From Swiss-Prot:
Coiled coil: none annotated. The lineage of its organism: Bacteria, Pseudomonadati, Pseudomonadota, Gammaproteobacteria, Alteromonadales. It comes from Shewanella pealeana (strain ATCC 700345 / ANG-SQ1). Its main location: cytoplasm. It is found in: Cytoplasm. ATP binds at residues 169, 171-173. This is Chromosomal replication initiator protein DnaA. Oligomerizes as a right-handed, spiral filament on DNA at oriC.
Length: 461
C-alpha cells in the first residue's frame, strides 16, 4: 500500500512543484518497502541531500495524512531499488554505454575541429582547464551544476537536451567544458564536440560551397555528444536551423547527448523556429543567474588563490559588493588589481583597489541607483513610478515594489534604512521582509525567478 501511495505522493509533488523542480529532483527517485520502512532511492548524493532537505516534510506529511499512525518510517539511500536493479541496470547499459568510436573521414568542408586527432581534448575543442572542481557554486548556479554533473555521469540518459540560459559571463561555457571533460574522463574514446553556433553555420556554408553536405551530415550525426554555445545566433538563419533540426533529431534518437546555451529562455529567442524552440525544452531547462554576494566573494578568493595572491577578506567583499553583473567582470577587475599591485609593489588594500578600479567603480555607481531601479521595475511591470512610493497594498503594486526593494539591496550599497527611505519613508523591517519574500518566491515561482533574472540583466547591462 505504501508503494502505491508513493505514486500518489509523486503526483502531489508534481502539482505543487514547478516542472523544472519536479524533473530535476523528484522524477529520478525510486521507492520500495523494506519491512516497515519505505526506502527512497536517489541517483546520487547531491539529489539525496537536496530532496531530504527540501521535500522530506512534504513527503512525511502526505503519508501521515493518508495512513495516520500506520505511516511507514522513511529512509533515503543512493542507487536503485533492489527488486528493480536488473531492469535499471539494463536500461542504464543502453543509455550510458558509449557507442564504439567510429572512424569518420575528414569532411571536405575542412573545419579544424573535424579533423581526426589522436588527442581527444583537441579533437573535441574541450578546454581541459574547465572542470567541475574549479567551478564556484552558489545559489545562482546550483541547479545548473547539479544537472551538468548528472549529464557527465550519464550522457544521453540524464537530461537530454540540457538547455542552460542566462547572461554573458555567468559560467555556462565553463559547465559545457566541465561536462565534456567528465565524459572524456569516463570514456576517452567518446567523441565530444563543443562549438559556438556560428561555427556550425560556417561549417554548413562551407559544405554547401564544396558540395559536401552529406559529409557534413554524417560528421555531426556521428558524434556522441554535441555542445553548442549561444544557440540564439541561429536566429533568422533558416537553412542552418533546418539542418540543425534534423541533426538534433538524429542525435536524440541515438541517445547522444546535446547541451545548448543561450542568453534567453528558449521560448523567448526571436528568429528561431517554434519546432526548434519546442525541442529545446524536451529535456531540462536551467537558468544560470548572476552570482549573489557570497558567490562573488568565493569567486574572487578562488581566483586570487590560483594566482598565488593573498586577497584580504575585506577587499574581496569590497569588490564583490560593487561589481555584480557577471563572473567575467569580477575576474577582469581582480586581474587589474593584481597587475597594478605587481607593478607598483604596493599591498592590496581597499584604498588601493579604489584607486586601481576607480573608473570601473565610478561607472557602476553611476549606472545603478535606487531611482534607476525603481524606474526600471515600474516600466517592466507597467505600473506608475508613483506606485513605488505609495501605500497601496494590492499585489499588482506591492509585488513590484518588493522586487525593487530586493534589487536595491542586491545592486546598490545603500543600507536597509536608506532603501526604505527611498520607498516613501518605509521602515527597514519592511525592506528586509521584501527581500526575504522575493528570495522565497524565486525558489517557488518560475515567473518570479525569470523576472528577477531579467531585471538584473537589464540593470547590469
Amino acid at each position: 500500500m505504501a508503494v502505491s501511495l508513493w505514486q500518489q505522493c509523486i503526483a502531489r509533488l508534481q502539482d505543487e512543484l514547478s516542472a523544472q523542480q519536479f524533473s530535476m529532483w523528484i522524477r529520478p527517485l525510486q521507492a520500495e518497502m523494506e519491512g516497515d520502512t519505505l526506502v527512497i532511492y536517489a541517483p546520487n548524493r547531491f539529489v539525496l541531500d537536496w530532496v531530504r532537505d527540501k521535500y522530506l516534510n512534504i513527503i512525511n506529511q502526505f503519508f501521515t495524512e493518508q495512513m495516520g499512525s500506520d505511516a511507514p518510517s522513511l529512509r533515503f539511500d543512493i542507487g536503485s531499488r533492489p527488486s528493480a536493479k536488473p531492469v535499471v541496470q539494463a536500461t542504464a547499459a543502453v543509455r550510458t554505454s558509449r557507442p564504439v568510436t567510429r572512424e569518420v573521414t575528414k569532411p571536405s568542408f575542412n573545419t579544424p575541429h573535424a579533423e581526426p586527432m589522436a588527442n581527444a581534448n583537441h579533437r573535441s575543442n574541450i578546454n581541459p582547464t574547465y572542470q567541475f572542481d574549479n567551478f564556484v557554486e552558489g545559489k545562482s548556479n546550483q541547479l545548473g551544476k547539479a544537472a551538468a554533473l548528472q549529464v557527465a555521469e550519464n550522457p544521453g540518459g540524464a537530461y537530454n537536451p540540457l538547455f542552460l540560459y542566462g547572461g554573458t559571463g555567468l559560467g555556462k561555457t565553463h559547465l559545457l567544458h566541465a561536462v565534456g571533460n567528465g565524459i572524456i574522463k569516463n570514456n576517452p574514446n567518446a567523441k565530444v564536440v563543443y562549438m559556438h553556433s556560428e561555427r556550425f553555420v560556417q561549417d554548413m556554408v562551407k559544405a554547401l560551397q564544396n558540395n559536401a553536405i552529406e559529409e557534413f551530415k554524417r560528421y555531426y550525426r556521428s558524434v556522441d555528444a554535441l555542445f553548442i554555445d549561444d544557440i540564439q545566433f541561429f536566429a533568422n538563419k533558416d537553412r542552418s536551423q533546418e539542418e540543425f533540426f534534423h541533426t538534433f533529431n538524429a542525435l536524440l534518437e541515438g541517445n547522444h547527448q546535446i547541451i545548448l546555451t543561450s542568453d534567453k529562455y528558449p521560448k523567448e529567442i526571436d528568429g528561431v523556429e517554434d519546432r526548434l524552440k519546442s525541442r529545446f525544452g524536451w529535456g531540462l531547462t536551467v537558468a544560470i543567474e548572476p552570482p549573489e554576494l557570497e558567490t562573488r566573494v568565493a569567486i574572487l578568493m578562488r581566483k586570487a588563490q590560483e594566482s598565488g595572491i593573498n586577497l584580504p577578506d575585506e577587499v574581496a567583499f569590497f569588490i564583490a559588493k560593487r561589481l555584480r553583473s557577471n563572473v567575467r567582470e569580477l575576474e577582469g577587475a581582480l586581474n587589474r588589481v593584481i597587475a597594478n599591485a605587481n607593478f607598483t609593489g604596493r599591498p592590496i588594500t581597499i584604498d588601493f583597489v579604489r584607486e586601481a578600479l576607480r573608473d570601473l567603480l565610478a561607472l557602476q555607481e553611476k549606472l545603478v541607483t535606487i531611482d534607476n531601479i525603481q524606474k526600471t521595475v515600474a516600466e517592466y511591470y507597467k505600473i506608475k513610478m508613483a506606485d513605488m512610493l505609495s501605500k497601496r497594498r494590492s499585489r499588482s503594486v506591492a509585488r513590484p515594489r518588493q522586487m525593487a526593494m530586493a534589487l536595491s539591496k542586491e545592486l546598490t550599497n545603500q543600507s536597509l534604512p536608506e532603501i526604505g527611505d527611498a520607498f516613501g519613508g518605509r521602515d527597514h523591517t519592511t525592506v528586509l521582509h521584501a527581500c526575504r519574500k522575493i528570495a522565497q518566491l524565486r525558489e517557488e515561482s518560475h515567473d518570479i525567478k525569470e523576472d528577477y533574472a531579467n531585471l538584473i540583466r537589464t540593470l547590469s547591462s
